[in-house]
């Protein structure tokens, strides 16, 4: 999970959606090569925007989904975990099964590993 702090701008759409901080392709590669099986973030696109590559406006999506086969979660509210200084947890997401869809709403659950 990547907490950029962007969720603090919610629900102000103008602030939340404009030029979000996030992962670069290099950051995504680092996480993928480190063994990440899914990557989530508190912004609306996981990656930083605008893109550093004028030819590809979603370089992290391209890399994670098409090249590395790693799914992403967007708009994950990590503020409560951060506020309680919970950095190690078991995470699972209960997704709605939608036939033919490329995404789904999810109920995220984080179970702390340490007190």
Question: Which residues make up each language-model segment?
Answer:
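Active-/binding-site microenvironments in catalytic and ligand-binding cores
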Residues: 1-115
């Amino acid at each position: 999970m990547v907490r950029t702090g962007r969720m603090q701008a919610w629900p102000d759409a103008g602030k939340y959606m404009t030029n979000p901080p996030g992962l670069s392709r290099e950051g995504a590669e680092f996480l993928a090569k480190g063994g990440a099986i899914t990557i989530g973030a508190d912004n609306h696109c996981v990656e930083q925007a605008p893109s550093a590559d004028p030819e590809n406006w979603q370089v992290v999506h391209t890399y994670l989904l098409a090249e590395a086969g790693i799914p992403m979660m967007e708009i994950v509210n990590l503020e409560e975990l951060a506020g309680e200084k919970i950095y190690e947890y078991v995470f699972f997401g209960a997704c709605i099964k939608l036939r033919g869809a490329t995404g789904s709403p999810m109920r995220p659950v984080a179970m702390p590993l340490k007190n």
